[in-house]
Amino acid sequence: MKMKTKIFRVKGKFLMGDKLQPFTKELNAIREEEIYERLYSEFGSKHRVPRSKVKIEEIEEISPEEVQDPVVKALVQR
């Protein structure tokens, strides 16, 4: 049985220095729960931001037509 990946748009903020930086990311995953782990991991490795400083405000499933990120769009069109 093959699991179908879904595309999610995530909005939130993270603390960079003493300022809250807004972010919007588009990620593909099988379940919404995977998004949390991938996002925390990415911010930790790229920005050295601890999980407690990342606030995810909204996660919504989007259709392939709504994708704006060129990398995610290329993955979807395969």
From Swiss-Prot:
One of its GO terms (biological process) is translation. The keyword rRNA-binding applies. Keywords: Ribonucleoprotein, Ribosomal protein, RNA-binding, rRNA-binding. The keyword Metal-binding does not apply. Coiled coil: none annotated. Gene3D superfamilies: 3.10.20.10. InterPro entries: Ribosomal_eL20, Ribosomal_eL20_dom. Pfam families: Ribosomal_L18A. One of its GO terms (cellular component) is ribonucleoprotein complex. One of its GO terms (molecular function) is structural constituent of ribosome. Belongs to the eukaryotic ribosomal protein eL20 family. Part of the 50S ribosomal subunit. Binds 23S rRNA. This is Large ribosomal subunit protein eL20. The gene is rpl18a.
